[in-house]
């Protein structure tokens, strides 16, 4: 059974909830997400199912607008993100998105590809390349103006 977040995700929410306008959860741990969001009923949350969210009713990808920025978000396993990012980039561009958020690799990533900015926050509970991470993005007037990969707070 995949269970990635345990208390790491809850620690991130505790630290960041007052500073964020919305949360985008990129899959693998939907049961943990539901529990972690209970104390924050006003937080706008968007989520997709990952390859370890067996039986989930959430979609595999989504599209949302934040401050004039069209955001395509997905776990990424259906777009082959462990092998290359071309399919993901094309899928985001086809939907008119300026930003594509993805997970699945458990590796933090940020890159501009043509008109699409690609961002992977890493993993709150099982980052493969170092400390567990999450991501913060600032969007203004249809553009990513700042991004950051942050280490998940310790206990």
Q: How would you name each of these model-derived features?
A:
Residues 57-95, 125-128:
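Active-site-proximal segments of metal-dependent phosphoesterases and phosphodiesterases across multiple
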Residues 5-12, 67, 93-96, 112, ...:
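Binuclear metal-dependent phosphoesterase catalytic core
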Residues 61-62, 108, 135:
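Residue-level detector of beta-strand structural context in well-folded domains
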Residues 1-3, 25, 75-77, 104-106, ...:
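Histidine-centered active-site/metal-ligand motif
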Residues 3-7, 30-34, 52-57, 79-84, ...:
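Active-site environment of divalent metal-dependent phosphoester hydrolases
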Residues 22-28, 46-51, 72-75, 99-104, ...:
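Active-site neighborhood of phospho(di)ester-bond hydrolases with catalytic His/Asp-centered motifs
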Residues 44-46, 70, 117, 145-146:
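Conserved beta-strand segments of alpha/beta enzyme cores
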Residues 2-66:
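Core catalytic region of metal-dependent phosphoesterases/phosphodiesterases
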């Amino acid at each position: 059974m995949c269970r990635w977040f345990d208390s790491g995700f809850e620690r991130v929410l505790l630290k960041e909830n007052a500073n964020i306008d919305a949360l985008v959860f990129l899959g693998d741990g939907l049961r943990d997400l539901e529990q972690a969001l209970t104390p924050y009923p006003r937080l706008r949350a968007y989520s997709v199912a990952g390859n370890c969210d067996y039986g989930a009713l959430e979609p595999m990808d989504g599209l949302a607008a934040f401050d004039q920025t069209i955001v395509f978000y997905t776990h990424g396993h259906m777009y082959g993100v462990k092998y290359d990012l071309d399919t993901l980039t094309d899928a985001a561009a086809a939907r008119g998105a300026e930003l594509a958020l993805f997970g699945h690799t458990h590796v933090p990533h940020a890159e501009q590809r043509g008109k699409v900015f690609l961002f992977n926050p890493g993993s709150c509970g099982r980052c493969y390349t170092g400390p567990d991470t999450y991501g913060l993005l600032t969007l203004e007037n249809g553009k990513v103006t700042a991004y950051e990969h942050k280490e998940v707070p310790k206990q």
